[in-house]
Amino acid sequence: VISGFYPDSVQVSWKKDRVDQSGVVLHSKQRNDSTFETVSYLTVPVVEWTTGDVYTCEVSHTGSRFNDRISMRYQKGGTVNLPVPGGNTPCTCPPSSCSGCMPKLVYQTDLNVTLENGGQLQYNCHQQACKIK
């Protein structure tokens, strides 16, 4: 989830070990505070995910010169630590009072993974860390 940006001009790209991938970016929605929000995701087969390759989501917003990225990779068992996004504070101002608002990256709080063999894994995410339920 990428939220809190204005104007509605955010670019999202996905990479697997620095090679461009075809991710999905949904149409932006305007929020009550007049900023925008969108969702992007990359579908990765389990056999590829478990090889340990690094997947990166890169977000840029020309209106605010915001650039950030989140990298992740499979880690067997235990805890998966996610980095805190770049430290830029999101702007939640109405469009009339600022020229550009910073987007912020929001982590999914619960993650359900369906394996190709029909099995399922559930993760509970809190404070930038995910643990298997």
UniProtKB/Swiss-Prot annotation:
Expressed mainly in lymphoid tissues including spleen, epigonal organ and circulating lymphocytes. The keyword Metal-binding does not apply. Glycans are attached at residues 32, 112. It is found in: Secreted. InterPro entries: Ig-like_dom (IPR007110), Ig-like_dom_sf (IPR036179), Ig-like_fold (IPR013783), Ig/MHC_CS (IPR003006), Ig_C1-set (IPR003597), Immune_Resp_Modulators (IPR050380). One of its GO terms (biological process) is adaptive immune response. It comes from the Eukaryota. Its main location: secreted. The keyword Glycoprotein applies. One of its GO terms (cellular component) is extracellular region. PANTHER family: TAPASIN. This is IgW chain C region, secreted form 2. It comes from Heterodontus francisci.
